[in-house]
Every structure is written in structure tokens, then in C-alpha cells.
């Protein structure tokens, strides 16, 4: 099992200095959705281009219309589950797919298991290109909840994984936690750990005071140095309701504490109703969906980043928050390994008492807050986009080199048709 961990530097070779690969990234989530997968793909796209790669992206359109926007190819899709915001596409003969196959990528990197993955695999087969897949989601937790540990569920997930990842020559996971997912059990020898990366320059310039004050006014909160921020998709598995339930206890310790929730999703109505019913509406504000390029401004409104999710694999929001100098206060979870050191760049909590103690302790000590801020900024440096892209490109080259060594590829046809 290979690992491209954040503590290791990729070995530089003479070949790797001149990267000129043609890479196709395939994803369901891109531009039209604000979530972790979108952030990963955008970061990887930018990083690979900075290394000299030609990059194109295949993604689902937010409507039934297919179109091309620069190097991004969007195929028409249908909304099949509004609650979970799932879209699928059946446009397997879309001319855009033929155009991508004719472009002949050197490698196809798939960031989804949905219908886009099926399209991308067909493109790879036509182009004679190897496939790398990244798994971003704990499917067992997402779909089966408390039944995920049962033998039938594990068997079903192993079968699903055997079919889904069969064509992938390597499977990228963003954290150690992912290795134990049942759907990856059939291909343990193909797993590579590459931690996600972010564009640090997008997050580190602080907001000018006038812009900061304007943002606070726009959401109806005070710029009082007591603001908690959570950037998340509003769905049940993110467990934001737990923080809302803890908030009255926090207000007894820190009466002027307030929470800014950045993001949208199917659970928003329930969360807002809880705030109204419990008298929290003046202390908790929901922004709705914010464009990815604007999210950094909202991180900078906060003094602490909070999360109750146990669904994360390698959360982009944890990295982005630290790049903005925010200490983290997160529910205990294996995904925090290597990201959050308890007492150094934030606090880990297990119950309501620990949550209140962690938040009030940081807000009550300027020295502690500044120490954790410095540690957060330092930790974020380990997850920069440059290192992320270098490690990923090193994997691409090793996959292509292994394939070349095994056998000479068949001559490619002059025309490609689906």
C-alpha cells in the first residue's frame, strides 16, 4: 500500500520536472455546488495547470442542457433526489464526450462513482488511457447509518466496490480513515493516500476592516470577537443540529457568542426551525449558498471554526479554516488525525460539556487564541495546492510508466465514436 502523506515530500525526477500530461478530471460536483469535492477538484485543476499539465474537466450540468465553458465540459443531467441533491445523466452519446475522447487524455482521474464515472471510463477506454479514481465519501455511513456494521451491508458494499473500481489502476483516498471502508476491501493493494490540498493564497489575506464590517451587517451579526463559523453542506450527516443544541449552554458561559452557518442544503429548514423554536435566531445566522470564490471572506468573519460532523474523510473546510488562522473545535473523529492536534491548533470534544469548555476557553484567552491561530496557519502550510498537485502528478506518472512497462499500447485510432 502506497502513501503520499503530508509529511513526505514527493521524490523529484528528471522526468517529473517537465510535466506535460493531458489530464481529464471527471466529477459530479463542480462550480455549481459549494462542497468539499468541488474544492478538491478546483484545487487539483489549478495545481496541475501550474505544473504545466493540460487539464479538462467533465462534469454534470445543473440543467438538462449540455455545454462547454472553456476547458470544462458539462453534460445535461436530471435531478433525481432533491433532498440529497443528486443528479444523474443519461447523455452517453453526447457530442461533448466524443470531443473529449478525440482529445486523447493521457490519464483520466475520476472523482465520483455516478454516471459521470461511467462516461469517463468509456472515454478512457476509447483513448487507451489509464484510470485513477478518488473516493471522497463514506458510503456505508451515508446510505446505511447505524446498520453500516452489519454483515449484509458490508458484503453489499464490497460487491459495489468490486464493480465500481475494477477499471481503476490506483484508488486515491485522502486520509488513513478511508482505508477501512468496506467498499474498498477488494482493492487494498491499489490504495494510495494523498491528502487534499487548497490554494492558500485565496484564504490568507485578511479582510479589510470596512469589508468585514459590511459582511457582518449583511448577515445581521455584530463584529464582536465572539463569532463561531461553520462552512458546510446542510444535511443530516453533517450533524450541525448538535452544535445548535449545545448553543444555549454556551450562551450561559459566553452571552455574546454567535454562530454563522455558511452553506445550504436539504436540512436547512429543520435547522432554522430549531433556532426559531429555541430563541436562537438572533444569535445564529444562515447565509445560504455562497459562490466558492467568496467563501474565504466568510471564514475571516470567524474567531473559531466549529464542526460536529463524524462523516468527514479529509474535510476541505478544516484546511480552509486553518488557512484563515481559525482554531478548530471539532467532534472527535478519526478524520482529524494529522489535521487537528488537541490543545495546539484547536480542541477536540466528545460531549456538550467539553464543547462549551473548549469554545469558552479559547474565546476567553487572547493568548491562547493567538497561539492556536499561529499553529493553525502553520498546519495549513502542509496542505498547500502545490504539494497536493505534485504528489498527484507523481502518481499519474507512476501509473503511466507501469502501464508502458507492462506492454506497448495498441495504436490509437484516428477517429473515436461512442
Where in the sequence are the language-model features?
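Conserved donor-binding/catalytic core segment of Leloir-type glycosyltransferases
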Residues: 217, 221-247
Amino acid at each position: 500500500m502506497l502513501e503520499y502523506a503530508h509529511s513526505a515530500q514527493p521524490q523529484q525526477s528528471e522526468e517529473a520536472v517537465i510535466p506535460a500530461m493531458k489530464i481529464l478530471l471527471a466529477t459530479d460536483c463542480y462550480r455549481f455546488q459549494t462542497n468539499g469535492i468541488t474544492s478538491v477538484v478546483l484545487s487539483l485543476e489549478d495545481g496541475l495547470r501550474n505544473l504545466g499539465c493540460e487539464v479538462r474537466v467533465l462534469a454534470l450540468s445543473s440543467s438538462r442542457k449540455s455545454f462547454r465553458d472553456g476547458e470544462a465540459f458539462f453534460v445535461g443531467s436530471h435531478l433525481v433526489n432533491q433532498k440529497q441533491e443528486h443528479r444523474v445523466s443519461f447523455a452517453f452519446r453526447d457530442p461533448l464526450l466524443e470531443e473529449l475522447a478525440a482529445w486523447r487524455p493521457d490519464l483520466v482521474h475520476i472523482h465520483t462513482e455516478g454516471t459521470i464515472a461511467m462516461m469517463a471510463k468509456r472515454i478512457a477506454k476509447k483513448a487507451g488511457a489509464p484510470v485513477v479514481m478518488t473516493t471522497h465519501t463514506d458510503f456505508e455511513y451515508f446510505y446505511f447509518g447505524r446498520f453500516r456494521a452489519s454483515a449484509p451491508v458490508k458484503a453489499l458494499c464490497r460487491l459495489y466496490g468490486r464493480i465500481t473500481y475494477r477499471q481503476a489502476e490506483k484508488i486515491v483516498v485522502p486520509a488513513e480513515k478511508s482505508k477501512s471502508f468496506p467498499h474498498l476491501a477488494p482493492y487494498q493493494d491499489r490504495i494510495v493516500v494523498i491528502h487534499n490540498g487548497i490554494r492558500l493564497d485565496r484564504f490568507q489575506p485578511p479582510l479589510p476592516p470596512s469589508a468585514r464590517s459590511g459582511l457582518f451587517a449583511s448577515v445581521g451579526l455584530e463584529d464582536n470577537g465572539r463569532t463561531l463559523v461553520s462552512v458546510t453542506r446542510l444535511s443530516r450527516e453533517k450533524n450541525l443540529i448538535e452544535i445548535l443544541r449545545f448553543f444555549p449552554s454556551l450562551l450561559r458561559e459566553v452571552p455574546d457568542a454567535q454562530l454563522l452557518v455558511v452553506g445550504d442544503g436539504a436540512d436547512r429548514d429543520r435547522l432554522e426551525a430549531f433556532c426559531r423554536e429555541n430563541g436562537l435566531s438572533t444569535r445564529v445566522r444562515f447565509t445560504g449558498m455562497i459562490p466558492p470564490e467568496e467563501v474565504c471572506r466568510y471564514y475571516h468573519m470567524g474567531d473559531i471554526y466549529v464542526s460536529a460532523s463524524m462523516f468527514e474523510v479529509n474535510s476541505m473546510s478544516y484546511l480552509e479554516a486553518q488557512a484563515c488562522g481559525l482554531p478548530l473545535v471539532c467532534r472527535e473523529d478519526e478524520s482529524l488525525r494529522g489535521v487537528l492536534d488537541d490543545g495546539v491548533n484547536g480542541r477536540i470534544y466528545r460531549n456538550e460539556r467539553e464543547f462549551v469548555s473548549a469554545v469558552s476557553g479559547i474565546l476567553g484567552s487572547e493568548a491562547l487564541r493567538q497561539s492556536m491561530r499561529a499553529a493553525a496557519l502553520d498546519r495549513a502550510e502542509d496542505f498547500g495546492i502545490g504539494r497536493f498537485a505534485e504528489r498527484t502528478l507523481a502518481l499519474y506518472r507512476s501509473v503511466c510508466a507501469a502501464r508502458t512497462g507492462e506492454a506497448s499500447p495498441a495504436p490509437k485510432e484516428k477517429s473515436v465514436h461512442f
